[in-house]
A protein has these predicted regions:
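ATP/Mg2+ or Mg2+-diphosphate-binding catalytic cores
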Residues: 25-80
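Glycine-rich phosphate-binding segment of PLP-dependent enzymes
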Residues: 357, 362, 366-391, 398-415
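Acidic, glycine-rich catalytic/binding loops that coordinate metals and/or anionic ligands
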Residues: 92-112, 234-246, 250-256, 260-313
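Active-site-adjacent loop/helix segments that line or gate small-molecule/cofactor pockets in enzymes
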Residues: 313-344, 363
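Surface-exposed, glycine-biased beta-strand/turn segments
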Residues: 79-207, 244, 294-312
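A conserved long alpha-helix in the C-terminal portion of kinase-like catalytic domains
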Residues: 1-22
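PLP-dependent aspartate aminotransferase-fold enzymes
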Residues: 401-471
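Short histidine-centered loop motifs in beta-beta connectors
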Residues: 180, 186, 218-245
Length: 471
């Protein structure tokens, strides 16, 4: 497509042509095998080909949309017209909560900005119910961003494999409005009930409604309202007409809304082909371009500006450029494509989009990143006093006793320092003072620190061409 641009009709045929080509290969190999019965290689690929053709589980509508997106085309027919109409009508839609949302505060639940959940692989029920408490927004009405990477989605449904770190869906495809349970919702525009269900799994939607809407040009689009009180099930049914401004549901409490702090998950979709009523509310960051095309920013339907509700993570290249500008040039950064770390837990680190990486490289995993007991001990002590060893404190000697208890009895004293570089520097001074000698035997490899003394015994530094500083 980049060399010879395809038409939409041609892109839509790719999936059928692919299957046709595979079927032709099977036919050809069968025909050749009938004439060369002693050559098993001819039909070696038939079994996997048949297995694919008979068992593939790929929705054709979604695949068409994916191929269109990859080729830079609108994902669905009429997408541009729908977005243009919604943007032109913005400020005219009925307020979803019956009141203007323009001046409400937008708070971030992103991987960069909050430490919930404490364990990024397991959101607790208390944490889910208290979302916003850490931000000081437990009772107020406030908004949550579209396109925001979050680590609060930890249920098995949010990953694409057997492991807790398997291709997690983290990026929020809706705008959240947090308010008290029982708050009534009013239809932003005229619609028809497409789905009205109660999904009672933990951390699911609870009550959920999908409305179908039609523009004056007869283009259809859909809005989803999640985490509702399922009381609407008593009087709403599929096909019911909902008038603009009509109250049609209310926010559910954690007992009925999937276990979350009361809010509505408000999402826009330009099609339901291939997803029907089972919309992904969050997307894999590596699949985000496609899902942004299917479920674009719904801010205009709330009479808000897209840019105000769109979350922008820290930009890796900008951070890297600033690092090069403000740090010394000899300070290296790992990997040609560096990881922008936003959080860490035990033996995993997470980037700005919530992707997990196994950390088997750094020293911190000796006890694990963000160890809750160690964090709490450090926090408690920082809240009391954080000074140095020129003053008396019983914790210093208690710590020294505990360290010495792990060593042979001829180790009698210890020095408390802040880093390995300082420890090695002090060890050099003590050894030279005690022995009266300067020579040091060290391995050819190994990092001993960044002080002058530590570098002087680091062969990997001074044995390089033009290396200097050997002790």
């Amino acid at each position: 497509n980049s060399v010879y641009p395809l038409k939409t009709e041609e892109v839509d045929l790719i999936w059928r042509l692919l299957r046709m080509r595979l079927a032709v290969s099977i036919v050809n190999s069968t025909h050749l095998a009938s004439k060369n019965k002693q050559d098993p290689y001819i039909t070696i690929s038939q079994a996997p080909a048949w297995k694919f053709l008979e068992n593939f589980n790929i929705n054709e509508s979604l695949l068409k949309a994916r191929l269109r997106t990859v080729c830079g085309m609108p994902a669905v027919e009429g997408a541009d017209r729908i977005i243009e109409w919604i943007n032109n009508e913005s400020s005219k839609f009925s307020p979803l909560l019956g009141t203007d949302l323009t001046n409400l505060e937008i708070k971030s639940l992103s991987v960069e900005n909050i430490s919930i959940p404490q364990n990024p692989f397991e959101l607790t029920s208390d944490e889910a119910r208290d979302i916003g408490f850490e931000l000081g927004k437990r009772a107020d009405i406030w908004l949550g961003y579209y396109n925001e990477p979050r680590l609060i989605y930890t249920a098995p449904a949010f990953r694409m494999g057997p492991w807790k770190a398997s291709n997690r869906r983290t990026v929020h495809l809706a705008i959240d409005i947090f308010a008290e349970s029982g708050t009534k919702l009013f239809a932003p525009l005229e619609g028809e009930v497409f789905t009205a269900e109660y999904r009672d799994n933990e951390l699911d939607y609870g009550g959920v409604i999908i409305l179908k809407h039609t523009t004056p040009n007869k283009d259809e689009f859909f809005t989803l309202y999640g985490h509702l009180d399922p009381i609407f099930m008593k009087n709403l049914k599929l096909g019911d007409k909902i008038e603009k401004g009509q109250s049609f549901c209310q926010l559910g409490s954690p007992d009925v809304n999937g276990g979350w702090a009361p809010h509505v998950h408000f999402q826009l979709a330009l099609t339901t082909d291939g997803i029907e009523a089972d919309w992904p509310g969050v997307a894999d960051p590596d699949d985000l371009t496609f899902w942004n095309a299917i479920c674009p920013n719904p801010a205009s339907l709330l009479n808000l500006k897209d840019a105000d509700c769109l979350y922008q993570p820290s930009k890796k290249q900008e951070v890297l450029n600033d690092r090069r500008k403000y740090f010394g040039g000899n300070l290296s950064v790992s990997y040609d494509n560096p990881i922008l770390i936003s959080r860490a837990w035990r033996h995993h680190i997470f980037d700005e989009w919530g992707r997990p990486y196994l950390d088997a490289y750094n020293n911190v995993p000796h006890v694990g990143h963000s160890h809750p007991r160690i964090n709490q001990v450090a926090l408690d002590q920082l809240n009391k006093v954080n000074s140095n060893t020129r003053y008396l404190n019983p914790l210093q000697t208690q710590f020294a006793k505990k360290i010495l208890s792990k060593f042979p009895s001829n180790f009698e004293v210890c020095y408390l320092v802040n880093s390995g570089s300082e420890a090695n520097e002090l060890a050099l001074r003590l050894a030279r003072e005690h022995s009266g000698k300067k020579g040091i035997i060290t391995p050819d490899e190994g990092y001993f620190g960044n002080t002058t003394g530590a570098l002087s015994i680091s062969a990997y530094k001074f044995k390089k061409p033009n290396g200097v500083g050997q002790a």
